[in-house]
């Protein structure tokens, strides 16, 4: 099995190294094509107005000056054009990609692009908690990653579907199994604008989340990782809402 690995945190990210190790538990034919720099939050964007610069880091490792989607396209259509990958793995992201995160996530977009190109694709992220970005439990993803991927592949991934995996913020032995769950939704009232002043008194702004009690919905990715379970969520490329489609057809028909 030929595996293409990408991410959105960049070619030097620790999570990418973790995912390479996970991939090598599954296959000895692993290729890495990742962004030259951190592309967190770029979603499914493409570099249409800038050229893509490709740098060979090692025999089967490449860095691209571009987005995660650019990287997957370069991997499938250029680097591996003679024989494409059988699986695209994107991650392991520093931080969870659950609920509406998936619409912003470059990690999820890497898997989405693989799906568009007809390759089975899985996005993987490692949640972190109060310890912050400096205390990510990468060993949890490393311990459970290959086993989780194997089970997903055994279950089968249909065309047009990608799989989003989130590992909880706990020690590997504290993981309470795998939960197949829906995409959740946060309380958007917690999203705030943090206004500050620079040294010259000019305002600048950060997006921030207010700290408040929030109860995630049952059967969601948010709830699963809160309960120390690995959240596995199938997502689809077709964003059509069928009930509304039917209702609109009756109204406008």
From Swiss-Prot:
The keyword Nucleotidyltransferase does not apply. A divalent metal cation binds at residues 8-9, 40, 93. It comes from the Bacteria. It catalyses: a ribonucleoside 5'-phosphate + H2O = a ribonucleoside + phosphate. InterPro entries: SurE, SurE-like_Pase/nucleotidase, SurE-like_sf. Its EC number is 3.1.3.5. Its cofactor is a divalent metal cation. Pfam families: SurE. GO terms for molecular function: 3'-nucleotidase activity; 5'-nucleotidase activity; exopolyphosphatase activity; metal ion binding; nucleotide binding. Keywords: Cytoplasm, Hydrolase, Metal-binding, Nucleotide-binding. It is found in: Cytoplasm. One of its GO terms (cellular component) is cytoplasm. PANTHER family: 5'-NUCLEOTIDASE SURE, 5'_3'-NUCLEOTIDASE SURE. Nucleotidase that shows phosphatase activity on nucleoside 5'-monophosphates. Belongs to the SurE nucleotidase family. This is 5'-nucleotidase SurE. It comes from Methylobacterium nodulans (strain LMG 21967 / CNCM I-2342 / ORS 2060). The lineage of its organism: Bacteria, Pseudomonadati, Pseudomonadota, Alphaproteobacteria, Hyphomicrobiales.
